[in-house]
Swiss-Prot record:
Function: Removal of H(2)O(2), oxidation of toxic reductants, biosynthesis and degradation of lignin, suberization, auxin catabolism, response to environmental stresses such as wounding, pathogen attack and oxidative stress. These functions might be dependent on each isozyme/isoform in each plant tissue. Suggested to catalyze the deposition of the aromatic residues of suberin on the cell wall and thus play a role in cell-suberization.
Organism: Capsicum annuum
Keyword Chloroplast on entry: no
Organism domain of life: Eukaryota
Name of the featured protein: Suberization-associated anionic peroxidase 1
UniProt-listed Enzyme Commission number(s): 1.11.1.7
Cofactor(s) named in the record: heme b; Ca(2+)
Binding site for heme: 30
Enzyme category, top tier: oxidoreductase
Length: 51
């Protein structure tokens, strides 16, 4: 299989996260809204809870 990688900006910092997981764990981060971009599937536009 493969993982879809996307970048999320939060507090001026850019995080690189792998989509397709129920949650992406980033320390001290809040909910991030991913903008749809390039070849990412519609699910990439969904918000992921970061906790």
């Amino acid at each position: 299989g493969f993982e879809v990688i996307a970048q999320a900006k939060l507090g001026g910092q850019t995080y690189t996260v792998a989509l397709g997981r129920e949650m992406v764990a980033l320390a001290g981060a809040h909910t991030v809204g991913f903008a749809r971009m390039g070849n990412l599937p519609p699910s990439a536009g969904a918000q992921l809870e970061i906790r």
